[in-house]
Each structure stands twice: as structure tokens, then as C-alpha cells.
A protein has these predicted regions:
Chain A
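Eukaryote-biased recognition of intrinsically disordered, low-complexity regulatory segments
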Residues: 1-22
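Short, contiguous acidic and Ser/Thr-rich linear segments
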Residues: 20-32
Length: 248, 645, 255
């Protein structure tokens, strides 16, 4: 199939960007979205143009490195799918596709479609861990964890840190990402001693980094490739406010 | 042949390997190792390249011990290292099930699984430490699967006869890596780790023969910079991407260890490559990488191809009598659960016979119809739902309706830099951990053992052994002006400039694809003398063309993904040649290395313990590599021919 | 704010690192627990939720009080008078009303302040807009919270001038409450002037009630649907209850 792409091009963080139109031909429906961009890039190089920079690594939906806003939706319209897993069979011949980078002040554009998401690392560094030195752990069976808690903690722990939640949120809020980690650790017995401190430090760090606040709009969970539920945000709020969370 | 492709040097020995009763060796070594005074640890700096399971766990633990750590990764966050993609699980000899597992059995299985090409002492230590890994990870909050009683669940994996594999749904690597990443985050916050994401190591700095630092390129600004330390740890992962198509992440590369190899570190067993049988087949020329489908699918799926070649009917239209369930036919006792290398080769054989299915005839069916009929659709969905979904996303076909198509793909590289029992390479002060070293797995790795090894190295082994070396430090302070430092940095700048200056007519990817094709055809699942000789010639010619005709767009002082690629490919060329030479010299079949000339009458791999019971450690010379042999002895596990019939 | 290249800049030098600075910040936060909490977006949202809930409480009582118009002129006027005498002699005349007015003003001020601060924070977080932005699942109600709130506030000002003070009322300041009310709603355009903000209020609460539960950590995957259903039901009942009086007047049930 043949497609028209409008791609955000920006030489570096300080220069002004703009949308540039490209036409790509003979795209196979079996290609992934990124493979389609590979094809375009190969052509751009041979034409002496600068290929489009975009982040990616695992190309199987787990590393969280890829992420493009495709026709206005982070990771594209297919639900629970990362950009690298999105395949061209979901597009039609003749379609126009607009491709933009994540937009948020704490995610400055580095080049073209590449943004700097290190703010997420700062949030985890603020407290997204259990302080346990190596080698001092009790036997793994010393503390049983009810299956239900373990499973819910796991659901939250599957966050890949891609940042689509921020990109989608009209407030540019990192709440879903932050809440996913707070929920993961807060539900396990191992995470209890630091639970209150963790929530406070992580939430405040997110604010300081310039993310917006959550007004419970729910776009984040809709685009989240791992379907992290809004319940995690409720749990984060409860932990932050020092209230006992209810529900799962 | 020796003179044609390589030379033979003096044999080497693992000087740090303790002797005595195997179960006490690790204790003995730890006791014999020198300790570093706590006050001195603050004055010592360690560089850790890589933030995967191995590098992440090592950096966190070293920082905790008090060393100053500098960490590097090429991704935008340490959390994205390729370990994140591991699906199946991690082995540990916990024997929580009481099904007869023990440290000794894990040791035994690993030595046997490695086809008797690994060191007994190392493997025993790995099995011992495995137990502590699970404790450590659980304490960090890694959400392993649990049973209703709240205790950890385990499963049997990769044909093991005991249930020793701990898992976190199909995302074990992710959860373990996040555990290590969080431990790192804690140390970054505490100011003990200086993290450098989007920074690639491009050379090793040697001063007076010791590893004293790395030269890096900042992938955003292009700045080439020196970083100094008292010891350097490489944890840069595997090099399966030399095949272009593999299950590895796109950025996986050999650069870090290859640069160290060029500076004198021996490279061991480069040819041992694990080909995983259950991957989604290539769908066209555009294919950029291959996706693994967890091995656990073979527990319930049945593998088959049409009985006769050229059968293009839809799978549902092929009657039972005209199907060949070839694994069940050839290996009646293990059936669909034969080890990876056997399943992979069998698939290749039926496809070579022209009986493969799907585009290009490179695929076999993995059929769940029986399982669905037997267990019900819901039960199958509960077990494999996420994998089916992943398959559906990629292929657009629903495995509930039509059989999956699978084909083998390059997955893991057992080879890597040679290290001694302390995980130190032949360059003093250079330590290598995780998939980047060659240790522990011999000629073939068992499922769920790579995660175990990475974490064993990083959390428990290296932090103990590196002290023995560092006790002699701190070493003299260095600066950019030091002649050996300046030379290293200059070499990096020159190389970057050279890549950009070629300005030819072919893209880096086109070279990489072609190189991968050569490797897959001649150094892939089956290797022959003639094929390997041909491959060496082809690789040399292609490499020469690369340096004459590659077109790297852009400049060096910016984010330039083509430049990154080109640099990695340049190193892959050199590695590829060494892999072929290693494969050529090893005229036996063992583990992940199958030589067409060395098989039993019924087509199974035939080892030659008499001649090849050694680690092949190669020295870089710039011309023909020099082979150093480290002989292997087996006191506890008697080498035997594997049989899965 | 993060500047360019932060991803590659060394996170910190080991001795004067940002990591250290951050640790200090989190351990050395000054001020009482409540004020520290309020600094974060989550704290602001909690304030909005609590103030919102209090305002909802007022509206429920107000709505029920309004239904007295159906009991006749005297009953309604008595009720209005009672509001001014309740609590006497413990409270001065209209004491209760003034307490309520001050209370509501403070509550509204807090609610609006937090709303404005959150809006500013959100605008700063997304300085560059998308060229194309598609909504995936956000509701109309959730998107109209800010403008809806402003319109509701404007309405309240008008409403007080109309029915409490009387200057904006067709019947004027001298008329009794019942007369003013009837004077209003005999005019269809004033019914519309009330109905529109009321519908917006309904939307505000449809999202607000669920949102408040979420903000206070009362959400949960299993509860999301029930709470949302309740919120919708509640908003419908409240708006309908308020609309009874104007519609009653318009169709002539109340004269
Ligand atoms: C799809 C898949 C599934 C797997 N499933 C399993 C499983 O179920 N069980 C199991 O035991 N094993 C599994 N494995 C194998 C296992 O995941 C890997 O062997 C293991 O994770 C390697 O860890 P590592 O820490 O050595 O390296 P990696 O995780 O690969 O990390 C390498 C690190 O080095 C950095 N790096 C690399 N080069 C440079 C450079 N030049 N400069 C700076 N930094 C650099 C990278 O940024 C990265 O941080 C699987 C592998 C794959 C591909
Ligand atoms: C000037 C007037 C008002 C403004 C500007 C305003 C604005 C807002 C905003 C921006 C929100 C947050 C949006 C969200 O949660 O998605 C909100 C929430 C809310 N508002 Fe209002 N509002 C106003 C008046 C009112 C009134 C009169 C009521 C009560 C009846 C009310 C009840 C609520 C409730 C219950 C919430 C939910 C709180 C939460 O999400 O935590 N608001 N309002
Ligand atoms: C049709 C709907 C409504 C009717 C008929 C109505 C009627 C009245 C009347 C008659 C009064 C004057 C009472 C008195 O002075 O004794 C009043 C006061 C008031 N109403 Fe309403 N009202 C309606 C809707 C609303 C709404 C939607 C709000 C808020 C969002 C609101 C907020 C107030 C306030 C704040 C006062 C002032 C109370 C005081 O004097 O302190 N009303 N209303
Ligand atoms: S919560 Fe979802 S969208 Fe946000 S970073 Fe995690 S995986 Fe991505
Ligand atoms: S979209 Fe934004 S407002 Fe909250 S619920 Fe999600 S973070
Ligand atoms: S590239 Fe790893 S998630 Fe898309």
C-alpha cells in the first residue's frame, strides 16, 4: 500500500521543529510500524537526507523504548499495543498518518521523534524501591504473599515506563506511571516499611519535575500498552494522603 | 589448516580456580580473597558497562559495599537493558517442591546441558548461589508467581525433570531487571552510582597493562570522553545480532567486549550459538528482528509439517494421515519437548526437505487443536493467552483458529570474553559478567539459566572476587593527557571520523543484513568445512566493501543513529570472521555448534571429547588469531553422549 | 525543569550530586503535614474533593429546601424566614446564614484556588501542543470541568443577585422570596438561564463525584463502575430536583 506520512522533524532540542510530508510506497501489511519507518529511512539515506530519529530497542513491546504519537494517539489507535508491535495491516492504502513525539515539558525533544524521558528515572530514584542490601535477605518463603496481592502487584509492575500515559494526559501528568510503582511495592509485605515515605517522595518529585496533576481524566489508562488501571492512581492518592486504600 | 586461518599459542589455565571438594570451593575462594578496608572502598571507583541483570545487579551491590560506581548503557534508561525481554523464568535449586532437586542436580543438569564444555567449579558455584538469588529478588519486591497459599510457584522448563523454574508470568526478565534497576536507583539517589544513559563505550583504556577506564561517546551530543576507574566491569550482553535477525534487541552489540578483545582480552568459544526453535518466522525482506515465542508453548502444542513437500493446502484441510508430527516420530520419549538445539535442527531439516509451511517455506506448525480439545479453550487461554495475543499482533492470525507457524532463530551466545574463576579477563582489572563472558554454560545454555547466571555474577560472585583485585588499589590517578589515555581517545575519534568519511553508496543496514545472511547460511544451525571457508572469504570481501562503500549520514556531534549502527556493524564483521574460524577449527558437534561432518549415523550430534574437551580462547593479533586452549576436566560428572530418543 | 541532554548529562558528581540534594529535600521538608501535602498535586486534588463534597452537601439541602415551593407561598416564605431566625438567640439574626455564607465562600475559594493552580501546572506541563490529538476514552464531563466550573461560579453570582439580594430579579428587591422565584420562572428565558448552568453542574458532578472518590483513594478497579453509576444517578437526581421548581412555575403548577 501507499501512504502519506507527516512526520515531526526537529534537528535538536533547541531548534524549531515542523511537520514534513513523505510518501512511502509498496508498504507490506505484514510490516511493523517501525519497519515501515526503516524503509523510509533507508530511502532518505540514499537520497542524501537525514533519516528520521526514533527510539526503539526490543521491538517486542517490553523495553518501553519506542513511542510515537500516531494520528493523535500515543502508540496508535490499537489498544494495549506499543508502537513497535503495531502492524501496518491496521492501516489502509492511501491513508495519511501524522507522527509526533511525546509532548510534555519534562520530556524535552532530543531530536525528531526522540524525547528525553529521564524524568521517569528521577521519580523511581526518589523512592521506587525496597531498601534491601544484597545478601541480607531472608528465605524467599519466610513471608508468604496472598496470591491476590501478588497478582495485583504484578499487574502494576508490568509498566514498561514508556511514557505514553504522560503523552496522552491532557494535564501532562505522570500519575499512572508513578502510581504503578507505588502500587506494585505498596501491595507487597516487603514494601510496607517504606510505603508512606515512598509515595510522598515519588509524588513530590513528579511535581517538581514539571509533570501536571491528575484530574482523573483517564486517557492514560486507555493508551497504556500494559493496561495499568486507574485504581493504581487511587491507591497512590491514598498512600500519599496517609489514608488506608480500599478496593483493589 | 592451522596455518591458513589461525595459529596455536600456549595453553592457558584458570589460575584462580580453587581445588578441593567441589562443594567447598566457593567458600574457600571467598576466604582466600583479599578484603578491601571499608575506608578504602570510598576511594575506589569501578566502571560497570551495561545495566542488564548482570551489570545492574553488580553496580547496585558494589555501590552498596561502598565503592564509587560509574554505570553506562546505550538506552535512554538503565531499565531498558535487553534482559527486560526474557520471558520464561529463572532456575534455582530451592527444591521447594521436594521433587528431588538439589544444588548437585542443578549442577549436573547444567554441565550435561552444556554438553560437557563448561567448567565444573563455575557451574557448581552457580548452582549454589542460585538459591540466594531468589531470596534477594523476593526481598526487593519482585512479584514472582505464587500459589494460593501465598508461597512461590515453580514450573518445569526446557525439558528439566524437576520444577525449579521461578517465573513472573511471561515477563520474568522484566521483573528481575526492574528489581536490579530499583536497587541501582536507590544507589543513584544516595550518590553512589553515577549513571550515564545513552552513552556507548567505544574503547577500553589500558594503562600499564591494567584496565583503567573506558572511552565513551555521548549518543546525544556526540562528545567523546574518558572515564577512569580502578577496575572495569563489562556486562554488555550477547552478540547474537551478528546474524542481523535474532531475538535480541536491536541495539545488542559486541562492541564493548570486542574493543577489549582487541586490547588483549581473550575471546572464548565465539562459535557456540543457541538457536531457539520457537520464534515467529520471517514474513518478508523488511523483517527487522525476530520474536521469541516462549518455549513453554511446546508443553501443549504439537509440532508438525505436511507429509509431502509442496503441500499448499490450509492446515485445517490437511487430514491427520497426511501430517508428520516429526518430533514425536523421531524422539518418541521426549517428543515435542526435546532440547532447543535438537528441535531447531529438526525443523531446519524438514524445511530443507521442502516440507516447510508459510511464506518461503521456512516454518513449521505448532498446533494447539489437541490441547484445546483436551483442556478446553479457556484453560489454554489462561496458560498462553498473552503469548497467543502477541502472536496475533504480529502475524494477524489467531492461534485458537489456525496453528501457529514457528521457525528457529538465533537467541543466545554462549561465547564471550574468557574469564577466570574470579570473572577476571586476561587483562588485569577487567571483569566480565553475564552473557558477555563465556563462563558457565559450556556449548549450550539451558532454558532459564541465563537470568540465573547474570544475577549470580552481579549480586554474589563479582562483588566478592573484585575485592581481591582492588585490595591493591587505589591506582595512580589519571587524566586525559596521559599518553595511553590520549591514544585511546584519539583512536575512537579517528574511527568515528573514518566511518563518516567513507560517504559511499550503501546503508549500514544493508551491510548488516548481508552479513547476517552469510552467518545464518554458513555459521548457523549446521556448519560445514566448505561452508565456513566460503563464509570467511565472503565476510572479508564484504568488510572490505563496507569500509569502501558505506554511507553514514549526518555528523558526529549529534544524535546519529546511523553512526551508532555503523560502528557496531564494523565490529560484527571482525567478530563474524572469528566465529567462523572457531567453528571451522572445532570439527566436532557439541551443543550449539553442529558440524555436518560430525554426526552419528542417524543424524545426531557427535562430540569428540578426545580432541575437543577444551575452551577455545582466541587472542587478537590483527592478522590470524592465536588459539589458546584451556583443558577441561570432569571429576563429578562423567561425560556421556546426550540421547533424547 | 529538565534541560536538554539531561538524559546524557552525568546525573551527579558523587560529592555534590543532585541525588544528595534530593534526599535532603525529602527528609527536610518543613511545615506541617497538611501544608506539605498541599504542595503536591495530589494534595490539591484532595482539597478539591473535600470542598466539592461539602458543596454537594449544601446543594442537596438547598435542593430539598427548594421543593418547598410546591407546598405553597407561605410555606416557602416561612422557610426563608426560618433560615434567618434559626439559632436565635444563640446566634444574631441571620447568623446561621452568614456562617453558611462565609463557610461556602471559603470552601469555594479553596476549590477554585486549587483548580487554578492545577490548571496552571497542567499548562506548564504541556507547553507544545499536538498537531493532531484524538481523544480515546475521556468523557465530555471530564473535559468540561474547568470551563463548567467557571460558568457555575458566574451563575452563582447572578443567582445570588437574583434571588437573595433581588437586584437582578424582575420582581425587584422588595418582593418576598416566593414572588421573586415565581417572577423568574414565568419567563422562559430565565428558566433557560437556570437550566443551562444546572446541566453543567450535573456534568461537573457526574465526573466530580467519581473523581472525588478517586482523589481520596477510594477508587478501585472493581468499584469504578458502581461509583460511576452512582455519580451519574446522583447528578441526574440533583439536577432534576432543582429543575422541578422552575418547570413547575413555567407550566403553572406553582403560581
Ligand atoms: C527474547 C529472549 C528471551 C529470553 N528468555 C530467557 C529466559 O526465560 N530465561 C533465561 O534465563 N534467559 C533468557 N534469555 C537470555 C537472557 O535474557 C540474557 O542472556 C540476559 O538477560 C543477558 O543479561 P546481561 O545482563 O548479560 O546483558 P543485557 O541485559 O543484554 O544488558 C546489556 C547492557 O549492556 C549495555 N551495553 C551494551 N553494549 C554497550 C556499549 N557498547 N556501551 C555501553 N553500554 C552497552 C546495554 O545498554 C545494556 O544495558 C532470553 C533472551 C531473549 C533474547
Ligand atoms: C467556580 C466554580 C468551580 C470551579 C472552577 C470548579 C472546578 C473544578 C475542577 C477543575 C475540578 C477538577 C476536575 C477533575 O477532577 O477532573 C473540580 C472538581 C470538583 N468539583 Fe468543582 N468547580 C467549581 C464549582 C464546584 C461546585 C459549586 C461544586 C459542588 C457542588 C463542585 C464540586 C466538585 C467536585 C465534587 C469535584 C471533584 C473533586 C476531585 O476530583 O477530587 N465544584 N472542580
Ligand atoms: C433552580 C434552581 C435553584 C433555585 C430555585 C434556587 C433558589 C434559591 C433561593 C430562593 C435562594 C434565596 C434563599 C434566601 O435568600 O432565603 C437561593 C440562594 C442561594 N442559592 Fe439557590 N437556587 C437554585 C440553584 C442553585 C444552584 C445550582 C446553586 C449553586 C451552584 C445555588 C446556590 C445558592 C447560594 C450560594 C445561595 C445563597 C445562600 C445565602 O444566601 O447564603 N442555587 N437559591
Ligand atoms: S503506565 Fe502504561 S503508559 Fe505509562 S509508562 Fe507505564 S506502561 Fe507506559
Ligand atoms: S489522563 Fe491524566 S488526568 Fe489523570 S487519569 Fe490519567 S493522569
Ligand atoms: S521497542 Fe521495546 S517496547 Fe517497543
Amino acid at each position: 500500500m501507499n501512504l502519506t506520512l507527516k512526520v515531526w522533524r526537529q534537528k535538536n532540542a533547541t531548534s524549531r521543529g515542523h511537520l514534513t510530508t513523505y510518501r512511502v510506497k509498496e508498504i507490506s501489511p505484514d510490516m511493523s510500524f517501525l519497519e515501515m519507518l526503516d524503509v523510509l529511512n533507508e530511502r532518505l539515506i540514499l537520497d542524501g537526507d537525514d533519516p528520521i530519529a526514533f527510539d526503539h530497542d526490543c521491538r517486542e513491546g517490553i523495553c518501553g523504548m519506542c513511542g510515537l504519537v500516531i494520528n493523535g494517539v500515543p502508540h496508535g489507535e490499537q489498544r494495549a499495543t506499543t508502537t513497535c508491535q503495531l502492524h501496518m495491516r491496521h492501516f489502509k492504502d492511501g491513508d495519511t498518518i501524522v507522527i509526533e513525539p511525546w509532548r510534555a515539558a519534562p520530556f524535552p525533544v532530543v531530536k525528531d521523534l526522540v524525547v528525553d524521558r529521564s524524568a521517569f528515572d528521577r521519580i523511581i530514584e526518589a523512592g521506587g524501591y525496597v531498601s534491601v542490601p544484597t545478601g541480607s535477605a531472608p528465605d524467599a518463603h519466610a513471608v508468604p504473599v496472598p496470591k491476590a496481592s501478588a497478582d495485583t502487584a504484578f499487574d502494576a509492575a508490568t509498566c514498561i515506563g514508556c511514557g505514553a500515559c504522560v503523552a496522552a494526559c491532557p494535564n501532562g501528568s505522570a500519575s499512572l506511571f508513578t502510581a504503578a510503582k507505588i502500587t506494585h511495592l505498596g501491595l507487597l509485605p516487603q514494601g510496607q516499611p517504606e510505603r508512606a515515605r515512598r509515595a510522598r517522595a515519588m509524588v513530590e518529585t513528579a511535581d517538581e519535575l514539571g509533570f501536571g496533576g491528575c484530574t482523573n481524566i483517564g486517557e492514560c489508562t486507555a493508551v497504556c500498552p500494559k493496561g495499568i488501571p486507574l485504581a493504581t492512581i487511587a491507591r497512590m492518592n491514598a498512600d500519599y494522603l496517609g489514608l488506608a486504600a480500599t478496593g483493589d | 589448516m592451522s596455518t591458513e586461518f589461525y595459529r596455536t599459542g600456549a595453553p592457558i589455565e584458570d589460575g584462580k580456580a580453587p581445588d578441593g571438594v567441589i562443594a567447598e570451593r566457593w567458600d574457600n575462594r571467598r576466604f582466600a580473597a583479599k578484603l578491601v578496608n571499608p575506608a578504602n572502598k570510598r576511594k575506589l571507583t569501578v566502571i560497570v558497562v551495561g545495566t542488564g541483570l548482570a551489570g545492574g545487579s553488580a553496580a547496585a551491590t558494589l555501590a552498596e559495599l561502598g565503592y564509587d560506581v560509574k554505570s553506562f548503557c546505550y538506552q535512554d534508561s538503565p531499565r531498558r537493558a535487553h534482559s527486560i525481554a526474557a520471558q520464561g523464568g529463572i532456575n534455582a535449586a530451592k527444591n521447594y517442591r521436594g521433587d528431588g532437586d538439589s544444588v548437585h542436580r542443578l549442577f549436573y543438569d547444567t554441565v550435561k546441558g552444556g554438553d560437557f564444555r563448561s567448567r565444573e567449579s563455575n557451574v557448581y558455584r552457580l548452582a549454589q548461589v542460585s538459591v540466594e538469588i531468589i531470596d534477594q529478588c523476593v526481598a526487593q519486591g519482585v512479584p514472582f508467581a505464587r500459589e494460593y497459599g501465598g508461597l512461590l510457584d515453580t514450573r518445569s522448563f526446557g525439558g528439566a525433570q524437576v520444577s525449579r523454574t521461578f517465573y513472573a508470568r511471561g515477563q520474568t526478565g522484566q521483573q528481575l531487571l526492574l528489581g536490579a534497576y530499583q536497587a541501582m536507583a536507590r544507589q543513584i539517589q544516595a550518590g553512589k552510582i553515577e549513571m550515564h544513559p545513552r552513552t556507548e563505550m567505544l574503547d577500553l583504556i589500558l594503562v600499564d597493562g591494567r584496565a583503567r577506564g573506558v572511552v565513551t561517546r555521548d549518543l546525544v551530543t556526540g562528545e567523546v570522553r574518558n572515564h577512569f576507574a580502578d577496575a572495569v566491569v563489562l556486562a554488555s550482553g550477547g552478540y547474537g545480532n551478528v546474524f542481523f535477525l535474532s531475538t535480541n534487541a536491536k541495539g545488542c552489540n559486541v562492541t564493548a567486549i570486542w574493543r577489549a578483545h582487541r586490547k588483549g582480552a581473550l575471546f572464548a568459544n565465539p562459535c557456540y550459538t543457541q538457536i531457539h526453535p520457537t520464534c515467529i518466522p520471517v514474513s518478508g525482506d523488511h523483517q527487522s528482528k525476530l520474536t521469541l515465542m516462549s518455549e513453554s508453548l511446546r508443553n501443549d502444542g504439537r509440532v508438525w509439517v505436511p507429509l509431502t513437500g509442496g503441500d499448499t493446502r490450509a492446515p485445517a484441510d490437511i487430514p491427520e494421515a497426511e501430517r508428520d508430527y516429526y518430533l514425536e516420530r523421531i524422539y518418541p520419549s521426549f517428543g515435542n519437548l526435546v532440547p532447543r538445539d535438537i528441535a531447531s535442527r529438526a525443523a531446519k531439516n524438514v524445511c530443507d526437505e521442502g516440507r516447510g509451511v508459510g511464506p518461503g517455506g521456512l516454518g513449521v506448525y505448532l498446533d494447539f487443536a489437541d490441547a484445546i480439545a483436551r483442556l478446553g479453550r479457556d484453560a489454554v487461554a489462561a496458560k498462553y493467552g498473552n503469548l497467543f495475543e502477541m502472536y496475533e499482533r504480529i502475524t494477524g492470525e489467531d492461534p485458537f483458529e489456525t496453528p501457529m507457524r514457528i521457525y528457529p532463530a538465533v537467541h543466545y551466545t554462549m561465547g564471550g570474553l574468557w574469564v577466570d574463576y574470579d570473572l577476571q579477563a586476561t587483562i588485569p582489572g577487567l571483569f566480565v559478567i553475564g552473557e558477555a563472558n563465556f563462563s558457565d554454560h559450556g556449548a549450550n545454555r539451558l532454558g532459564a539459566s541465563a537470568l540465573m547466571q547474570g544475577l549470580a555474577d552481579g549480586y554474589f560472585v563479582l562483588p566478592n572476587t573484585i575485592g581481591d583485585y582492588l585490595a591493591a588499589g587505589p591506582f595512580e590517578p589519571l587524566d586525559d593527557a596521559h599518553p595511553e589515555v590520549a591514544d585511546a581517545a584519539e583512536a575512537v575519534r579517528t574511527r568515528v571520523a573514518k566511518l563518516l568519511a567513507v560517504n559511499g553508496s550503501r546503508t549500514p543496514d544493508s551491510f548488516h543484513r548481508e552479513l547476517g545472511r552469510i552467518m545464518w547460511d554458513y555459521c548457523g544451525m549446521e556448519r560445514t568445512d566448505a561452508g565456513l571457508r566460503k563464509a570467511v572469504g565472503l565476510i572479508q570481501a564484504l568488510r572490505e566493501e563496507f569500509w569502501r562503500d558505506v554511507l553514514v549520514s549526518g555528523e558526529s556531534e549529534e544524535l546519529n543513529q546511523q553512526l551508532e549502527k555503523a560502528g557496531r556493524i564494523a565490529d560484527f564483521f571482525e567478530l563474524a570472521e572469528l566465529m567462523c574460524i572457531d567453528a571451522l577449527h572445532r570439527t566436532e558437534s557439541c551443543g550449539g555448534h553442529f558440524r555436518g561432518e560430525s554426526q552419528t549415523p542417524d543424524g545426531e550430534a557427535l562430540r569428540d571429547d578426545e580432541t575437543f574437551s577444551y575452551v577455545a580462547a582466541w587472542e587478537y593479533t590483527g592478522d590470524r588469531p592465536v588459539l589458546h586452549r584451556e583443558h577441561l576436566t570432569f571429576e563429578y560428572v562423567k561425560p556421556s553422549q546426550r540421547s533424547y530418543k | 525543569m529538565i534541560d536538554r541532554g539531561a538524559a546524557t548529562a552525568p546525573v551527579q558528581a558523587p560529592d555534590q550530586g543532585a541525588g544528595r540534594a534530593r534526599t535532603e529535600r525529602t527528609t527536610a521538608t518543613k511545615g506541617s503535614r497538611a501544608t506539605t501535602r498541599y504542595r503536591g498535586a495530589v494534595g490539591k486534588k484532595a482539597v478539591m474533593a473535600v470542598t466539592g463534597a461539602l458543596m454537594i452537601g449544601f446543594l442537596v439541602l438547598h435542593m430539598i429546601g427548594n421543593l418547598k415551593v410546591f407546598a405553597g407561598r407561605d410555606s416557602f416564605n416561612d422557610y426563608a424566614a426560618w433560615l434567618r431566625t434559626v439559632g436565635e438567640p444563640m446566634l444574631p439574626p441571620s447568623g446561621f446564614l452568614w456562617i453558611q455564607r462565609i463557610g461556602l465562600l471559603v470552601i469555594l475559594a479553596l476549590h477554585i484556588t486549587a483548580a487554578v493552580q492545577l490548571t496552571v501546572q497542567a499548562k506548564r506541563a504541556r507547553p507544545v501542543k499536538y498537531h493532531v490529538k484524538r481523544r480515546v476514552q475521556q468523557s465530555y464531563a471530564s473535559r468540561t470541568m474547568r470551563w463548567g466550573g467557571v460558568i457555575i461560579a458566574a451563575f452563582v453570582v447572578y443567582h445570588i443577585l437574583d434571588l437573595t439580594v433581588g437586584v437582578a430579579n424582575p420582581a425587584g428587591t422588595a418582593a418576598d422570596p416566593y414572588t421573586r422565584l415565581v417572577a423568574d420562572f414565568q419567563r422562559w428565558y430565565l428558566v433557560v438561564a437556570y437550566a443551562v448552568p444546572l446541566l453543567l453542574l450535573g456534568l461537573h458532578l457526574r465526573h466530580g463525584v467519581w473523581s472525588a472518590a478517586q482523589s481520596l483513594g477510594r477508587g478501585g478497579t472493581a468499584r469504578e463502575r458502581p461509583i460511576k453509576l452512582f455519580a451519574t444517578g446522583f447528578a441526574v437526581v440533583l439536577v432534576a430536583g432543582f429543575l422541578l421548581a422552575p418547570v413547575g412555575v413555567l407550566v403553572g403548577v406553582v403560581k
